[in-house]
Amino acid sequence: MPALVLLGAQWGDEGKGKATDLLGGSVDYVVRYQGGNNAGHTVVVGDQKYALHLLPSGILSPGCTPVIGNGVVVDPSVLFSELSGLNERGVDTSKLLISGNAHIITPYNVTVDKVTERFLGKRKIGTTGRGIGPTYADKINRVGIRVQDLYDESILTQKVEAALDVKNQMLTKLYNRRAIATGQVVEELLGYADKLAPYVADTVLVLNQALDDDKVVLFEGGQGTLLDIDHGTYPFVTSSNPTAGGACTGAGVGPTKISRVIGILKAYTTRVGAGPFPTELFDEDGEALRRIGGERGVTTGRDRRCGWFDAVIARYATRVNGLTDFFLTKLDVLTGWEQIPVCVAYEIDGKRVEELPYSQSDFHHAKPVYETLPGWSEDITKAKSFSDLPKNAQAYVKALEEMSGAPISAIGVGPGRDETIEINSFL
């Protein structure tokens, strides 16, 4: 049976939670493979709305085993807050598995993240301030704390001491902050050990055995392709690999096991935080997209920057991820526009460019080249098949498909679980 990767094909916030939830009833495992509680997924089930930051969206599907892989960074306080909130609403969270090799976001990681952004001022990246970047930095510098370290106090103490030797120098001498005591951090982290224990597992072994047993495994990326540390709009990126290759390293599953890679595309474009955004709108259209689309970050609460659909970015996502399908979301938000511009290329220094610029400088100077497509006024939220859509909406979808380089196999026409048109089965 297949292993599928589902990821954002833009700058995140594309509606991955809706897509994962749709597939959750048909898969056996849903796996987060990177990121942390800097991601935000909103899932609507009936009249219930769930905002998830760290937990896989599949936790809302009763027959599914949710997994937090080794590539994820885990803030235990956020984890237990989310679990408690779901339990209070009657959601069974007992099947959750967490990799013992996942790294822990420590209190000093959060502190460093916040004071660094404050210190940088106008030069800041616009992080969520949740300690994600510093935790990944510790991982690369080999001073990170892993989940399994919570079960050996001696090793945990040594690792915290080693990390704070450097962190406290930075906090006291550069940022004029108080030093953080090793004992205080160790005590707090050890306090999570017993609560975490029922969930900790060798998830690499579990997932590979599941695939050998013909189970269906869905790998769920956080953020989006253009926020990838290697393939995104660096330095305005996240600290991990949301792209398809990250599923292999972040979950411990070989690339030959993956059969489909599904990119989630919003029918327009949004971005949170700093960085280039060629199709960004600063007029009433941008404000209307933000208002109608409810474009406010689930994690940050910040208003999202909004713009028209960018086919250059979509083609890039197809290439770097090897996308086999697209899931187009929020098509309903565009209802009411008489004309809908779509960016088909950029103009850079007077030249037309149809692929994403290699140079950061060029991307900053890219101006969108638009083609205008006719809009529609009919309500599409009740559409159950592609033929139910107005002709102009059908033409819009077909145009995006042709420009983006992979078939659009599903379309979101509203926030609800049942407000989806499935054109081709993902399984």
UniProtKB/Swiss-Prot annotation:
IMP binds at D13, E14, G15, K16, N38, A39, G40, H41, T128, R142, Q223, T238, R302. Mg(2+) binds at D13, G40. Binds 1 Mg(2+) ion per subunit. It catalyses: IMP + L-aspartate + GTP = N(6)-(1,2-dicarboxyethyl)-AMP + GDP + phosphate + 2 H(+). Substrate binds at V298, T299, T300, G301, R302, D303, R304. Its cofactor is Mg(2+). It is found in: Cytoplasm. GTP binds at residues 12-18, 40-42, 304, 330-332, 412-414. InterPro entries: Adenylosuccin_syn_GTP-bd, Adenylosuccin_syn_Lys_AS, Adenylosuccinate_synth_dom1, Adenylosuccinate_synth_dom2, Adenylosuccinate_synth_dom3, Adenylosuccinate_synthetase, P-loop_NTPase. Keywords: Cytoplasm, GTP-binding, Ligase, Magnesium, Metal-binding, Nucleotide-binding, Purine biosynthesis. It comes from the Bacteria. PROSITE patterns: ADENYLOSUCCIN_SYN_1, ADENYLOSUCCIN_SYN_2. Plays an important role in the de novo pathway of purine nucleotide biosynthesis. Catalyzes the first committed step in the biosynthesis of AMP from IMP. Homodimer. This is Adenylosuccinate synthetase. It comes from Streptomyces coelicolor (strain ATCC BAA-471 / A3(2) / M145).
